[in-house]
């Protein structure tokens, strides 16, 4: 039995709609327009499908659960915010609707380091890159 191409197109449409709504919601969280994180059922309601159907469809279309994309994007946003030294880690946590200790647990679970360790290693890496660039500029060619 051949599965109609229309079925696969709809799967990808649902997945794309979810990712679009996810990005919009996370932008709203970061900007402060929204103060509570959505759950899968909230996204399902926005795109007019049942939560179980949304989860199954995204898993089938992408190989990953909706939570995978949510956590991946949340980690990207967290890392970006942590790269700004003027934002305290506790403020990053609260902006992303976490209390600081739960944010640390979340971040460490997905990155293998605490937010503080990530921030320190990020700036250490930047300093090393800057030093390498300076060293390259100072080297004089023997020819």
Q: Which residues are covered by each model-predicted region?
A:
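Alpha-helical bundle regulatory/interaction domains
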Residues: 1-52, 59-61, 65, 88-104, ...
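Short alpha-helical segment immediately N-terminal to, or the first helix within
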Residues: 32-33, 80-84
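Residues in the recognition helix of alpha-helical DNA-binding motifs
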Residues: 57, 69, 81, 106, ...
